């Protein structure tokens, strides 16, 4: 018997796979698992129900399938009890299962340390933030299960972020936009490897893992901004300015921008709103300089660079590579504060900076903090992570930034140094 029997953070896969749950057709527990398929994002058990006779592909409880498990009847080629509100998951799944890709998939296996007992963390996803959040889980498996070798399945563009200590990296040569596909070639690669291990588990790949205990330097090789040096280092603020997720001045402006996107030939007019965002960022910088004349600024993001002159170091680009990623990460790590619109673009900035001011759209209230790599357990969270309305004017953003600098010493002393919290 494994010493991890019943461990809720591990899903037994080989040699004795755990059934994902009851039969979704008849609710019977009398099910038999006849293997597992790894076609891409989903990891699915090949299940036969001894009660109703259904043959199914049923999601193992990893990633988003932990909360939203899907099942496919392999006889009828149809989803089982699919909820319409979850069509963002089941529609791509059944579409690609019905038309699997025959394209070869290049998977590069890099072995750092051989292990006979392993846990596989599948981070494949079609969204940048989803991949990164799944990858954050690696830290917990490395720390909690030192006798299990960690294998990370990762899109090639994320390979630079795989943390030190990982036993194996299976780097998949697919773009994020291709990750929805059903790839027999990828499954064949995994199947060929599985039987070479004595014991295999799946890592849960939680969608929103605890971050405050994670050592981000293990992932990026860059030490994050040390909180105790907040008011000792030169003031530095980094703005994250994407062209595809804008800071709008008004609600009518946002409506017009979206309407232009549907009008084909008029899409070019949307560039005006990108320029408007730059003007708002520069107004924020000027307002910050009124209170903190020595402040320095960096601008990053997927965008065409230019327009900031000597006001800020402009690291924006549309051509991403590992060198650009590292330049951005170093900018975050030198920053007391990062400022940006809600989105996955805030995960690495907040993992390295001391704090942030986030512009939060109304339709993302339910996702608040999901894009923030929260570094602090205590009341410093409230002080260091600030959220403003999506139409907040530049001076409002600037007031939050300058208040973080002017009030840090007093707040930090009263809420962390003068008390018992720092002894935990």
Tell where the protein language model's regions lie, with residue ranges.
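Catalytic donor nucleotide-activated moiety binding site of glycosyltransferases and closely related
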Residues: 239-245, 262-325
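A donor-sugar binding/catalytic signature common to diverse glycosyltransferases
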Residues: 328-371
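Secretory-pathway glycan-assembly enzymes, especially type II membrane glycosyltransferases
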Residues: 1-236, 240
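A short, glycine/small-residue-rich beta-strand->loop->alpha-helix junction that serves as a flexible
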Residues: 124-134, 245-250, 274-276
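Leloir-type glycosyltransferase catalytic cores
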Residues: 205-222, 368-424
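Short, polar loop motifs at secondary-structure junctions
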Residues: 156-158, 301-306, 342-346
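Short loop/turn segments at strand-loop or loop-helix junctions that form parts
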Residues: 116-122, 234-265, 300-302
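Short loop/helix-cap segments at secondary-structure boundaries that form the rim of catalytic
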Residues: 161-166, 305-314, 348-352
């Amino acid at each position: 018997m494994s010493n991890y029997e019943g461990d809720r953070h591990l899903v037994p896969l080989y040699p004795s796979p755990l059934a994902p749950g009851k039969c979704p057709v008849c609710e019977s527990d009398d099910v038999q698992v006849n293997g597992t398929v790894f076609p891409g994002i989903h990891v699915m058990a090949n299940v036969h129900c001894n009660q109703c006779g259904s043959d199914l592909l049923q999601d193992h409880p990893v990633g988003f399938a932990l909360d939203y498990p899907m099942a496919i009847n392999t006889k009828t080629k149809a989803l089982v009890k699919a909820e319409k509100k979850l069509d963002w998951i089941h529609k791509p799944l059944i579409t690609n299962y019905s038309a699997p890709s025959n394209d070869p998939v290049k998977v590069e296996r890099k072995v750092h340390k051989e292990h006979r007992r392993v846990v596989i963390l599948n981070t494949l996803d079609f969204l940048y933030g989803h991949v990164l959040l799944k990858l954050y889980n690696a830290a917990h498996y490395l720390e909690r299960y030192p006798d299990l070798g960690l294998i990370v399945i990762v899109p090639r563009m994320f390979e630079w972020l795989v943390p030190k200590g990982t036993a194996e990296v299976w780097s998949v040569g697919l773009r994020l936009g291709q990750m929805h596909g059903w790839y027999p070639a990828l499954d064949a690669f995994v199947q060929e490897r599985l039987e070479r291990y004595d014991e295999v588990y799946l890592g849960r790949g939680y969608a929103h893992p605890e971050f405050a205990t994670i050592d981000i330097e293990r992932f990026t090789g860059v030490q994050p901004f040390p909180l105790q040096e907040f008011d000792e280092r030169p003031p530095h603020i980094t703005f994250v300015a994407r062209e595809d997720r804008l800071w709008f001045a008004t609600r009518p402006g946002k409506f017009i921008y979206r309407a232009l996107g549907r009008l084909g030939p008029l899409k070019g007019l949307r560039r005006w709103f990108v320029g408007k965002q730059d003007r708002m960022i520069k107004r924020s910088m000027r307002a910050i300089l009124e209170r903190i004349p020595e402040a320095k600024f960096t601008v990053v993001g997927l965008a065409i660079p230019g327009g900031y002159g000597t006001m800020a170091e402009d690291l924006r680009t549309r051509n991403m590579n590992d060198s650009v990623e590292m330049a951005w990460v170093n900018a975050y790590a030198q920053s007391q504060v990062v400022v940006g619109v809600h989105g996955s673009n805030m995960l690495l900035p907040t993992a390295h900076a001391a704090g942030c001011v986030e512009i939060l759209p109304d339709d993302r209230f339910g996702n608040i903090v999901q894009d923030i790599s929260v570094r602090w357990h205590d009341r410093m969270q409230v002080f260091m992570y600030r959220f403003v309305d999506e139409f907040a004017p530049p001076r409002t953003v600037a007031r939050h930034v300058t208040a973080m600098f002017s009030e840090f010493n007093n707040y930090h002393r009263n809420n962390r140094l003068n008390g018992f919290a720092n002894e935990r």
